[in-house]
Regions:
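Glycine/proline-rich, positively charged
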Residues: 42, 46, 89-182, 186, ...
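Conserved, mostly hydrophobic/aromatic
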Residues: 7, 19, 37, 52, ...
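N-terminal binding-site loop/beta-alpha segment at the start of enzyme catalytic domains
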Residues: 1-78
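Short, well-ordered coil/turn segments that N-cap beta-strands
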Residues: 12-17, 48-51, 74-78, 114-118, ...
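Active-site beta-loop-alpha junctions enriched in small/polar residues
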Residues: 22-24, 55-57, 83-87, 122-125, ...
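Terminal-tail/helix-coil boundary detector
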Residues: 2, 219-253, 257, 272-277, ...
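Alpha-helix N-cap and loop-to-helix initiation/capping positions
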Residues: 29-36, 62, 66, 93-103, ...
Length: 327
């Protein structure tokens, strides 16, 4: 059985590895074989993955629809996570007003073909709506039985503190991986102290830590990585990209010493932080699934972590611990 982890001080428990479905959007990650990705959903459940993460903005709507169909009769076997808070077809881009959150949640339920959502997240902070209003809407959805838990995504410590005055988020979902360690400064310690689960997205560095890229890799039109920016970090700008690839090659050699892949090293590194409830990975097919699942039982030693940091230092690759969070 795969390792199970609790979300902070709540009763929400899931597999340590989660199935991320941004790639299922069919619009933001280049071509994807929808049938193969759908088949991977059932295979993931068989492999012990119990958490599936999506959002209405992925596509928009495609990811929720594909996941809902793929889960089928196995819905009760999983922890289903989705997100609202974007006006995907208009401006302003973010909307966490009470009216919007309630209405969009109904749409999520329909697309996912379910009567309840295990964890509903506010996708990005809405700087124009009081958090008290948003939290009130989430509390009402919970009371109505339409969601079991609620949380936030991409929120700072100050934002979480304000939310805590009006309820208790079960989780904060933010990017965290070897090339982006911004959350180590404040957010991860806060979540650990306050009993809030932490969901790490981008565990594989949006592909940088898979070993699949080369200096000649280009991203097709419509793939968000083609813009160079990754949540306010220049990870996919050519100069940085080439440095990161050199770093990944050395990490690959380090992982091979333990008979592992660089992707497994990346997953094990994220899961090694005590605040992390679940590490999300995008899974396109069953072969990727098998590789990722095999990483969960690997516990990195202090020596392993020191070797990783030494590689970053020698290659001159920043980890952005002190950089500002994207909000």
């Amino acid at each position: 059985m795969m390792e199970q982890r609790r979300f902070g001080d709540t009763d929400l428990v899931s597999s340590a590895l989660g199935f991320g479905t941004w790639e299922m959007s069919t619009t933001e990650y280049g071509h994807i074989d929808v049938d193969e990705a759908s088949a991977a959903v059932g295979a993931a459940i068989d492999s012990g993955i119990t958490l599936f993460d999506t959002a209405e903005a992925y596509g928009p709507y495609h990811s929720e629809e594909i996941l809902g169909r793929a889960l089928g009769t196995r819905r009760k076997e999983v922890v289903l996570v989705t997100k609202v808070g974007f006006k995907v077809d208009g401006t302003p881009a973010r909307d966490s007003t009470r009216e919007w959150v309630l209405a969009r949640t109904e749409g999520c339920l329909q697309r996912l073909n379910t009567d309840w959502i295990d964890l509903l997240l506010i996708h990005w902070p809405d700087h124009d709506t009081p958090f008290a209003e948003t939290m009130g809407a989430l509390e009402d959805l919970k009371t109505a039985g339409k969601i079991r838990h609620y949380g936030v995504s991409n929120f700072t410590v100050e934002m979480m503190e304000e939310c805590e005055r009006h309820g208790h988020p079960a989780a904060n979902q933010i990017g965290y991986h070897l090339f982006d360690r911004r959350m180590e400064a404040q957010v991860l310690p806060y979540c650990l102290e306050q009993g809030i689960g932490f969901m790490a997205y981008g565990t594989l560095g949006f592909g940088l830590l898979t070993g699949a890229f080369t200096p000649d890799t280009t991203f097709e039109e419509g793939d968000w990585r083609s813009e160079g920016d990754a949540f306010n970090l220049p990870l996919f700008e050519q100069e940085h990209f080439l440095k990161e690839l050199r770093c990944t090659e050395r990490l690959k050699t380090l992982a091979a010493r333990a008979g592992r892949s660089v992707a497994q090293l990346a997953i094990a590194w994220v899961l090694g932080h005590p605040a992390v409830s679940v590490a999300l990975v995008g899974i396109r097919n069953r072969s990727e699934l098998e590789e990722n699942v095999a990483a969960v039982d690997w516990k990195l030693t202090d020596e392993d972590r020191a070797d990783i940091d030494r590689i970053f230092a020698e290659e001159g690759v920043p980890t952005y611990v002190d950089a500002l969070q994207a909000v």
